[in-house]
Amino acid sequence: MVRLTDSEKAEVVSLWSKVDEKIIGSEALGRLLVIYPWTQRFFEHFGDLSTADAIMKNPRVQAHGEKVLSSFGEGLNHLGDLKGTFAQLSELHCDELHVDPENFKLLGNILVVVLARHYGKEFTLEVQAAYQKFVAGMANALAHKYH
């Protein structure tokens, strides 16, 4: 469960209403793959991941980034039960994909950077603090089924 105050929740939801999941998701996932290249092993079937430019322009990275960000958006609708909401996704990443749960934290922190880049002055200290809590809750929920 993420414990956001009413004010924090309003900040997160307000900014999220402006988010283009395709653009922000694509950039966030692309940056994860560039900055932390060991994460590429989960996406080898996506084709060319040989350079930062290739990763950022890769249509499969872009599509998956949008899908990932859509899940974050879904999380906003279930702040009181993120673990239940993402139980199946957690099991998939744990049991089938064998993703290191630390990667969820990395992606969340990159998402915060990308949001700050795109929303500049709107991304105040208070908004960042609220988003850090939210992405930490998402990372915790996605890591919940790990043994």
From Swiss-Prot:
MF terms in GO: haptoglobin binding; heme binding; hemoglobin alpha binding; metal ion binding; organic acid binding; oxygen binding; oxygen carrier activity; peroxidase activity
GO biological process terms held by the UniProt record: hydrogen peroxide catabolic process
Q: Keywords assigned by UniProt?
A: Heme, Iron, Metal-binding, Oxygen transport, Transport
Q: Which organism is it from?
A: Dendrohyrax dorsalis
The chain positions of domain Globin read 3-147
GO annotation, cellular component aspect: blood microparticle; haptoglobin-hemoglobin complex; hemoglobin complex
Keyword Chaperone found: no
Annotated binding of heme b, by residue: 64, 93
Q: Which residues form a coiled coil?
A: none
Highest taxon in the source lineage: Eukaryota
- PANTHER family hit by this protein: HEMOGLOBIN FAMILY MEMBER (PTHR11442), HEMOGLOBIN SUBUNIT BETA (PTHR11442:SF42)
Query: What does the tissue specificity note say?
Result: Red blood cells.
Q: Does the keyword Metal-binding apply?
A: yes
How does it associate, per the subunit comment?
Heterotetramer of two delta chains and two alpha chains.
The family annotation for this protein states:
Belongs to the globin family.
Name listed for the protein in its UniProt record: Hemoglobin subunit deltaH
CDD domains associated with the record: Hb-beta-like
